[in-house]
From Swiss-Prot, chain B:
Domain of life: Eukaryota
Stated role: As a component of the minor spliceosome, involved in the splicing of U12-type introns in pre-mRNAs.
Identification of the protein by name: Armadillo repeat-containing protein 7
Stored SUPFAM superfamilies: ARM repeat (SSF48371)
Record-level GO BP terms: mRNA processing; RNA splicing
Species lineage: Eukaryota, Metazoa, Chordata, Craniata, Vertebrata
Modified residues (Phosphoserine): 169
Keywords, ordered alphabetically: mRNA processing, mRNA splicing, Phosphoprotein, Repeat, Spliceosome
Repeat is among the record's keywords: yes
Residues making up the signal peptide according to the UniProt record: none
A GO cellular component entry from the record: spliceosomal complex
Pfam families noted in UniProt: Arm (PF00514)
ARM repeat segments: 57-99, 100-140
Species the sequence originates in: Homo sapiens (Human)
Amino acid sequence: MASSGGELGSLFDHHVQRAVCDTRAKYREGRRPRAVKVYTINLESQYLLIQGVPAVGVMKELVERFALYGAIEQYNALDEYPAEDFTEVYLIKFMNLQSARTAKRKMDEQSFFGGLLHVCYAPEFETVEETRKKLQMRKAYVVKTTENKDHYVTKKKLVTEHKDTEDFREDLHSEMSGFCKAAEALNTSAGNSNPYLPYSCELPLCYFSSKCMCSSRGPVDRASDSSKDGRNHHKTMGHYNHNDSLRKTQINSLKNSVACPGAQKAITSSEAVDRFMPRTTQLQERKRRREDDRKLGTFLQTNPSGNEIMIGPLLPDISKVDMHDDSLNTTANLIRHKLKEVISSVPKPPEDKPEDVHTSHPLKQRRRI
Amino acid sequence: MAQKPKVDPHVGRLGYLQALVTEFQETQSQDAKEQVLANLANFAYDPSNYEYLRQLQVLDLFLDSLSEENETLVEFAIGGLCNLCPDRANKEHILHAGGVPLIINCLSSPNEETVLSAITTLMHLSPPGRSFLPELTATPVVQCMLRFSLSASARLRNLAQIFLEDFCSPRQVAEARSRQAHSALGIPLPRSVAPRQR
């Protein structure tokens, strides 16, 4: 059966509002009741057809309302279009497709001057060039989005592997000494970080000395390229010209995984973008990061009491002053010793009450005899 | 009525898509199949879902549904393919799975949306640059496009014209045109059904 018109401005099947689906299974019911319809790029258009506009001379208001969603190129009333009594039909052409999509989504089924608007696309009004451009833009958008996504996926894989080898990392850290460990951490972070997040390379760089910077700059670029191509972490690590034995143990124990605070930082800074992490994992991450910072801090500052559980800020050590008198020195030492005892005894009970620690900690510290 | 699988709200996008696919495969209700297929086809519009859709083999599900008798299912399936085929990985999957003949078959559907989606899908499947996929520019297909370019429907005319201009060489078009003059009726034009006016 032929349609009532192939001419522009006549009723088409895709203009008709379909009935809302009421037999949907509960788990797939959306927030708004919707018809069963598939939207393809063919159906979407910068041209919108608006039906159900009350015939009370509100064209200007209508256009102003739609203009909220984007620039409008042209608009006109469609007088020949079959319309309900006392309603008018308008055609609005937006400058770009995205505005039209938003406008349709927001304005469809909205009340307007007492009438209910029905908004739909009108691709039949497009010229050949407009259709061609529409298809090309859609293709470009998809290609660009999936290319970006590929790199996020690479980063995601690195993160999940990183979590698996947490234990490996702890062991490695305890084995190696200060600077070497820092260098290793720098290597892994630089080598396996996302090439599209250059700051992830730079963050650990500014932590550590400039010695690392020059030598790892070159490999970073090569590493990023090869990780993009093959995702073969053996190769990326092979490019590094640091300590050979260090590298080998790295490769053997870590294999394809990342292990360093730098990568953690890069990941968390872009957490909001793509990753869904349950809250418990976030808390664990933060705890781990705190511990790593502490460990790095202790390595750099050579804290003798390395096994303390530190809660709250690291207070400055009380300087030891020689009083040039034996009895005075003894007294001073006793007091210092007492203070240390008091400080160290505080963290133990309030593992359940961290707030008390924070408040009681400075109080005890300030007591002077 | 369709079944109601228990889906945890926290299961995420992949879980939801999995539930849809499962329902599609298990349900007996045509309505439910249509709803689920439409849902999947709309998901196929958003590139962020492509990884999941490939994982769940939804592309094969779409290709299989092209052979269904229910015209609505075919319309939704080809719509889904049309939505996701600009992506390179999806395109390769469809080509390797032998999807091109199935999509060419859709050109003879009486449903206008199906035909439009099929044409667009074929255009996206063409390799970039001026090299053409031989199946796409075979004479029957070009002849079909020539007939579409004379259609009363503006949308069909436009798409056919773009296909002939951008995806066929002038020689192929000329050859198809000359053969058409002698051959019997080719692929029938689709019709779009509009409801009667009040």
